[in-house]
């Protein structure tokens, strides 16, 4: 006998399958080099291993978010307008990464590095979102989704 599953479960299974396929596109060494590029100026303020662990998680989340919204690019929407669709989720990722780095770093409340750190977090998350978007759009165009 066949098992009956709801539409919600089916969508969730399909989304997980797509995410697994997209994660094959990620490269850990590329993530680590991007971490070094973005957060090199804060080298004395953070312990590198702790920061790498968190940044890898946030890079994966941002990459998958961009890949999820790449479907709209396949149907003719620009990257900018697709980014506006997920502005709330991307902003949440930026804020969470910023809070993570503030909690694990040695940056004081009145320090001028806070604004610089926030801009670095914005750049880091948005660059991974863009990469996920372009790779996801490529997969859609090649019909590999």
Regions found by a protein language model. Name each.
Residues 2-145:
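Intrinsic-disorder/low-complexity detector
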